[in-house]
Amino acid sequence: MPFSADSVTSLRQLADALAARSVSAEELARTYLARIEQAGALNAFTHVDAERTLAQAREADARRARGEATLLTGVPVAHKDVFVTRGWRATAGSKMLANYESPFDATVVERMAAAGMVTLGKTNMDEFAMGSSNENSFFGAVRNPWDTDRVPGGSSGGSAAAVAAGLAPAATGTDTGGSIRQPSSFSGITGIKPTYGRVSRYGMIAFASSLDQGGPMAHTAEDCALLLNAMAGFDAKDSTSIPPEQGGVDEDFARYLGQPRAGASESQPLAGLRIGLPREYFGKGLSPDVEETVRAALRQYEQLGATLVEVSLPKTELSIPVYYVIAPAEASSNLSRFDGVRYGHRAAEYRDLLDMYKKSRAEGFGAEVKRRIMVGTYVLSHGYYDAYYLQAQKIRRIIADDFQRAFAQCDVIMGPVAPTVAWKLGEKTSDPVQMYLADIFTLSTSLAGLPGMSVPCGFGDGNMPVGLQLIGNYFDEARLLQTAHAFQQATDWHLRRPAKA
């Protein structure tokens, strides 16, 4: 039977087809480039360079012919436009960097290229990763492939939409407060935010340095494991990268996939697994359709042998104010470098250097970015640092401790990714607080630096996807992926595709 990309459901299938020479990397790249062109209305990509992509694909084919291929050689991937890429624009979704081209590759891009993966293009995103709906991009809003009148989630909305619509088999994303998990949930794909420090931030345009973390977005847990194998590892160029002596060792994140837990059977591969359900994740604010879908997924886990245990994360409601003090404070510092002098947007007319700074930043940044810079500058200012920033950091420590108390009672924590399914475009843009509340279940994981993922588990109102959130303890990605994979072996939610894909 001739190869057809339409029948592909995982990266493993693509890798096997490439290894068997059923399809070449160049043929595969041409297929996905054609899809990207046809689906331009989704606005998932900010930059596509077909010739550059095809050159990479031809090199992947040559590498395979020389017998130097890795498992992922020739497999296409899209990169969130927050990762700098030599020869491609790196805009962070902002007018400030609309025409910026980096002289070097981000470590994540470099490592995936070293594995032989082929870059399809750069995906749209909320400006400087500040947003939950991908409506804050200078390049326009991204549309959800399941319902093009709805948001795909943010800030990695372009990556989520691209994977969901079949425009790319996989994509990179970043997660500062939920920006891999929430769009994965809204778009019906699988995504994982690793432990903070697992994946290098070198070459990742910074929003909040103590929170930002890169990770993969794809269709299956196995896909994410294979991608994480390529992405993760210590990087001396990133001061926040975890060195081997502190746990940042290279490992095979796919090593437990398909294996029952110790002492478990094939029919109940998760026997002995204790799943913690935070009571704060199932209360006021959670829409009934999402709760029903998530609880159905939890019943499936019980059938796989797991036991459900109630736990408490008492500071969950404080995660929003804590995050929106710490993240804007760090953004205020990080974004001070964008002034139009060495790179980035520069105002056309100005009186002097100070006027040029002011006008360039006023013209280059969008409304949400300006709002967060102002909030961050305020909380760091004299007289307010102790009252806001220092207090927020203290509560952040308490939030991390709460997770450790919960993990004393369970092996993995589960719950909804978001309180609702994806909302309509424009529905929350006039109310920033309502937009921020959409991240209530993802922020605390980021504040604690824990690994978390979203796994498709059904559909809610409007036949829109719902994601189940899995949270593991530090460095527990392999077990987290094993737990997600077992669910996907027993269900087919991850195989569902939007009608137009």
Curated annotation (Swiss-Prot):
GO terms classed as biological process: translation
Alphabetical list of Gene3D superfamilies matching this protein: Amidase signature (AS) domain
Domain of life assignment: Bacteria
InterPro entries for the chain: Amidase, Amidase_CS, Amidase_dom, AS_sf, GatA, LisH
Reactions catalysed according to its record: L-glutamyl-tRNA(Gln) + L-glutamine + ATP + H2O = L-glutaminyl-tRNA(Gln) + L-glutamate + ADP + phosphate + H(+)
One annotated Gene Ontology cellular component of this protein: glutamyl-tRNA(Gln) amidotransferase complex
Active site: K80 (charge relay system), S155 (charge relay system), S179 (acyl-ester intermediate)
Pfam families documented for this protein: Amidase
Keyword line: ATP-binding, Ligase, Nucleotide-binding, Protein biosynthesis
Job of this protein: Allows the formation of correctly charged Gln-tRNA(Gln) through the transamidation of misacylated Glu-tRNA(Gln) in organisms which lack glutaminyl-tRNA synthetase. The reaction takes place in the presence of glutamine and ATP through an activated gamma-phospho-Glu-tRNA(Gln).
Assembly: Heterotrimer of A, B and C subunits.
Protein name: Glutamyl-tRNA(Gln) amidotransferase subunit A
Annotated source species: Cupriavidus pinatubonensis (strain JMP 134 / LMG 1197) (Cupriavidus necator (strain JMP 134))
Chain's gene name: gatA
